[in-house]
From Swiss-Prot:
This is CLOCK-interacting pacemaker. Residues 283-315 form a coiled coil. Residues 1-42 have a biased composition (Basic and acidic residues). One of its GO terms (cellular component) is nucleus.
């Protein structure tokens, strides 16, 4: 009975620690154990009863420890939480070598023995973080797309109804330098752009310059080659013409030299013939030969006339007489010509 009372007291302590829900669940088991303890008085029943109570405490310690572990997790919402509590019990585990062969099958051999020591309770203070919990403030007017770019004009939602439109006012003396600086900046930007354009144009011109020079040099060299070819052809033609003229001159010179030689020879022969008297003899022989030819032609004509006369006499044909007259007329003409030639010679 004392052992049963000890088990009951331990169960009550554990129920007080574990909470209201667990206590309510354990109440019917308590009544059952008390009624069974009143009925049974054996040692084995008491041992089994203690074993069941210990098993019940073990099963109930599982969810409670898990609950306390969940409670130990830090949360930023409620800083006021109960302190963590851990209960330590001295349990001795008895591992038997094996069931005895002679033991009855219904006997229960306890495997856990309780020591006669009071349980120890350890309190762990909750760890409080020194850093303050960061609170995220939600901006109802947060627009990431609009705020990621530079603002040109305010968003309609950010405008205030009390803000009035700016009135048209005159420009003061303070605003003129600002406008002038803006103009100067714009002029400077335009000048820099123009300078950049000019620089790019100069770069392109410098890059295109050697190409143009190479093209020009190639064209000039081609033109020079053509001019050289033309000059060479002209020189060849002039040389050919000069050679032809020189050959003609040489021929003329040769002809003139030959004629001069002939004339000199003739003059030399004339001088020699005139000095020797042979020239007059040659002239007379030449004239005599010419007279001889003339007399020979006259003799031939005279023979023809004699024959014509003989035929005309024999035939008394007027045609023959006509032929005779024609031949005589020719002889007369020839004689007159000879006379005129002689007179001219004289």
């Amino acid at each position: 009975m004392e052992k049963n009372q000890k088990c009951a007291t331990e169960q009550e302590r554990f129920k007080a620690r574990s909470g209201h829900g667990d206590g309510q669940r354990a109440e019917p088991r308590k009544t059952q154990t008390t009624t069974e303890s009143d009925k049974d008085s054996g040692y084995s029943d008491v041992a089994s009863e203690c074993l069941s109570s210990v098993e019940q405490t073990d099963t109930e310690e599982g969810p409670t420890t898990s609950r306390w572990n969940v409670a130990l997790k830090p949360s930023g919402k409620t800083p006021s939480q109960p302190q963590s509590l851990v209960v330590l019990k001295n349990l001795l585990v008895d591992q038997g070598s094996g069931p005895e062969p002679n033991a009855s099958s219904w006997a229960v051999h306890p495997s856990i023995q309780l020591l006669q020591t009071s349980p120890q309770i350890v309190f762990f203070p909750p760890t409080v973080s020194s850093s303050k919990p960061s609170t995220c403030r939600k901006d109802t007017k947060y627009l990431p797309i609009l705020k990621s770019y530079t603002k040109i004009a305010p968003h309609p939602s950010h405008r205030v109804s009390n803000i009035s439109l700016p009135c048209a006012r005159k420009r003061g003396p303070d605003e003129r330098p600002h406008n002038q600086t803006k103009r100067q900046c714009s002029k400077g930007h335009s000048g820099s752009r123009k300078g950049m354009d000019a620089a790019t144009l100069l770069d392109t011109g410098v890059q295109q310059g050697p190409v143009d020079q190479n093209v020009k040099e190639s064209s000039v060299s081609a033109k020079n080659k053509e001019l050289d070819m033309q000059l060479t052809t002209q020189n060849i033609n002039s040389n050919e013409k000069g050679s032809r003229v020189a050959s003609l001159d040489t021929q003329q010179n040769l002809l003139s030299a030959g004629q001069q030689n002939k004339s000199q020879r003739f003059q030399n022969t004339l001088d020699i013939l005139h000095r020797s008297g042979l020239l007059s003899i040659a002239m007379k022989t030449k004239e005599l030969a010419r007279h001889n030819q003339a007399t020979q032609s006259q003799l031939e004509k005279l023979q023809e006339q004699v024959q014509l006369y003989a035929t005309a006499m024999s035939s008394n044909n007027p045609h023959d007489w006509q032929r005779l007259q024609d031949s005589l007329a020719e002889v007369v003409k020839g004689d007159t010509e000879d006379l005129s030639v002689r007179e001219m010679d004289l």
